[in-house]
A protein has these predicted regions:
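A short, basic/flexible loop-to-alpha-helix module at the beginning of a structural domain
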Residues: 1-5, 87
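NAD(P)H-binding glycine-rich loop region in Rossmannoid oxidoreductase-like domains
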Residues: 50-100
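SDR active-site strand-loop-helix element
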Residues: 10, 36, 79-83
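N-terminal Rossmann NAD(P)H-binding glycine-rich loop of SDR-like oxidoreductase domains
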Residues: 5-27
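Glycine/Thr-rich phosphate-binding loops of Rossmann-like dinucleotide-binding domains
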Residues: 17, 43, 88-89
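Conserved glycine-rich Rossmann-like NAD(P)H-binding loop of the short-chain dehydrogenase/reductase
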Residues: 28-42
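Short alpha-helix adjacent to the SAM-binding motif of class I
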Residues: 42-49
């Protein structure tokens, strides 16, 4: 199902993305995998691992930014939503800090 498809993974530089991307490349032959995350440093580090693989693309953005997400979804067949807030207590104390109206 994922072979020859375009996949967007939100939060793609996190622990799930770092496991999902190599597994997907090994088990399937996707047309492209777009790593969508807001962490430029983690994207840079991950890009070094896949510098010779033209199927891997990187897209800086936040899932709370509707227009940026819409641009990232262009031509995408499947979405794996792995974006999350890692530090939960501050979000529980101030839920509005992690929300953005769309």
């Amino acid at each position: 199902m994922l072979s020859n498809s375009s996949i967007l993974i939100t939060g793609g530089t996190g622990s799930f993305g770092n496991a999902f991307v190599p597994m997907t490349l090994k088990r399937f032959n996707p047309k492209r995998i777009v790593i969508f995350s807001r962490d430029e440093m983690k994207q840079w580090e991950m890009a070094k691992l896949y510098k010779d693989d033209p199927r891997i693309r990187f897209f800086i953005g936040d899932v709370r930014d509707k227009e940026r997400l819409r641009r990232a979804l262009d031509g995408i067949d499947f979405v794996v939503h792995a974006a999350a807030t890692k530090i939960v207590p501050p979000a529980e104390y101030d839920p509005l800090s992690v929300l953005k109206p769309m």
